[in-house]
Amino acid sequence: MPLASNPVAFLPSSTAHGDLPAAAFSRSSAGCLQLCRPLTPTSSLQCNAISRPRTEEYIDVIQNGLPVIKWHEIVEDDAEKDSPKDKVGELRDAVRSMLRSMGDGEISISPYDTAWVALVADADGDRPQFPSSLHWISTNQLADGSWGDHATFSIFDRIINTLACVVALTSWDLHPDKTHKGILFIKKNIHRLEEENVEHMPIGFEVALPSLIDIAKQLQIDIPSDTRGLREIYARREIKLKKIPSDILHQMPTTLLHSLEGMPGLMWQKLLKLQSEDGSFLFSPSSTAFALQQTKDHNCLKYLTNHLIKFKGGVPNVYPVDLFEHLWAVDRLQRLGVSRYFQPEIEECVAYVYRYWTEKGICWARNSEIQDIDDTAMGFRLLRLHGYEVSADVFKHFESGGEFFCFKGQSTQAVTGMYNLYRAAQLIFPGENILEDAATFSAKFLQQKRANNELLDKWIITKDLPGEVGYALDVPWYASLPRVETRFYLEQYGGEDDVWIGKTLYRMPYVNNNKYLELAKLDYNNCQALHQQEWKDIQKWYRNSSLGEFGLSEGSLVQAYYVAAASIFEPQKSQERLAWAKTAILMQTITSHFHHSAEQKRVFLHEFQHATGGRYKTTRTLVGTLLRTLNQLSLDILLAHGCHIHQPLKNAWHKWIKTWEGGGGGAELLVQTLNLCGGGRRNRWESEELLSSHPKYEHLLKATVGVCDKLRRFQHRKDCNGCMGSDGGIRMLDIEAGMQELVKLVVTKSPGDLDSEIKQNFFMIARSYYYAAYCNPGTINFHIAKVLFERVQ
């Protein structure tokens, strides 16, 4: 018995815990989905992508697939902890202010880079060119004598920052007390270098630290230079320097320009031709400061002077970071489920990125001659989602011999770079082979890292990177319902505790901050409280309509509402959400009740066609329940928006009833219901005739119905192992191709296009079918409990 004939049917009690097979998909070497063994409630989808929820606070037990809720506890808890509405408004205003004030990027100061700037002498050579940098160093030493990130202790970060600051102060014979404390910290802790996780080694650390030690020796600073950890660092340095192609370094822009301060034998006349437009060397203050020391170049001086003014004496480890900030802020807000509050600001962020998009990709800053796969993948994904035309061929610049890389010549692969490539590759259009290859490569890389428990990244120390990667691998984008992703990301996002790794640890306050997280938690709990009230209303409607007498279980009821609420969660979309849920519930009831009787089907259709309003006001028949529900939905829309949808809605049902015998048509009815019930909220009312005659509407409907029908038939033709038989007739390649075509229709814009919400409705319905086909019943039960009933703490 399949999970469901459509994505709104819940398993009966015998299968609520996964006793019967449910198919799972896994990505094949060709980049498409293939059938594999069924998932169980303890399989990777449930255990790796998502941790066990704290459902004991709200759920006694799952009986017959239905969470038994302690409603009184929820009500009391809400009353105690609910924040006032003005708190949400206050947080929205604060976040909006951040987004509107975005410029070159908000970023923390790097003591290491500031020290290199402080080392620069003026034209006469006997005074510091930038005394404000020395002042910053002198006023930002930590209590233990070190310099570095105040909240996260990394010995890599503390040692290189502290040694650089000690060197800078000593070179100008300033603050001997502070240098003494710094030296003591280094002596006490330098042995810990061998204990640190090498994945968190800062950029260029193995070259920069030995260079600083050499300078320290010249200044007669007494620090250890022969510990086991340092010997390993020096060995890494030799390997890296041998890999550096001197001719290429001086001929074309490479990532080596970011770390010039650690390299010997540089030919500055050639290197100056490779400066960025802003006068920097690949946006690195320390590299640029070293260049200024060696060349006295005016453009280097101008770059550093401008940023010293902005940061009041300090400098970051990299600047600007405008594209990085714009992209990652949008990504975080979307995944946290609060992007709807900031649509104008998000549109501006995405438009800003598009202004600097190139056919070779982008990096963290505008107008760069160097591109990286991380920023390019994030940019590609968000631009495509927002309707911009971006070619998948951009990823050909990051592929060689079937492998993908972040930078040419990189020494190690970053987990987050491959993670964002994997996410981007799922927005594939038909025929984009490069994205199939990218998905295959990145998925394999991430799966191997997960299997080896190596999901650490060289660019960020975050709260739960394994959870983020696990969710992406186990719940592909086609199956990822918005509220499900948000519910788990709320536990994975670390807010201001997440810290990035560059030449030193650094923070991006407009990307990682607690205001985003606090707003998202409040918003989620507010939406969840509304959903729980709607669920109680659905239960009351179910009882009053006697749907249980017609064979509909309460398990089917909760899944129908859950799928709708997890897809359309916004409070202002309550009417669409309830219309989706009730439509799905009635379809399931009618289909199952008349499954074995063709004569009963004909009678039902005849009664529906010839029904008059008064006759069915109180009768407890399926026809009566259906007519009363349509009347109520239509009346709700009329009162709220002044739109008459009763006849079009009844027409849609009539079409479905005539065709349901073949098992199809459910997706079309759901889409039509959503578009009719949601039309009143848009700026203009889209009539049934206008919608149905629009060429793109017809294409979207055909694509949606086609792929949903394949997914429905796929579920019905699984064999006892949860896998398709050889003659099943449904190729997963066809389903993937159908989803790709639908995504292209939904996200691309054209003259005279449909309203974006109408287009999104098609994808939401297809995604719900995909979700039902992909997830096993145990996982769905788990999601229901967590998304609908587990409050975010």
Curated annotation (Swiss-Prot):
Matches recorded under InterPro entries: Isoprenoid_synthase_dom_sf, Terpene_cyclase_plant_C1, Terpene_synth_N, Terpene_synth_N_sf, Terpene_synthase-like, Terpene_synthase_metal-bd, Terpenoid_cyclase/PrenylTrfase
Pathway: Plant hormone biosynthesis; gibberellin biosynthesis
Keyword list, A-Z: Chloroplast, Isomerase, Magnesium, Metal-binding, Plastid, Transit peptide
E.C. numbers: 5.5.1.13
DXDD motif, short sequence motif: residues: 372-375
Cofactor: Mg(2+)
UniProt-listed Pfam families: Terpene_synth (PF01397), Terpene_synth_C (PF03936)
Domain comment, as recorded: The Asp-Xaa-Asp-Asp (DXDD) motif is important for the catalytic activity, presumably through binding to Mg(2+).
Protein name according to UniProt: Ent-copalyl diphosphate synthase, chloroplastic
Organism: Salvia miltiorrhiza (Chinese sage)
Lineage, opening ranks: Eukaryota, Viridiplantae, Streptophyta, Embryophyta, Tracheophyta
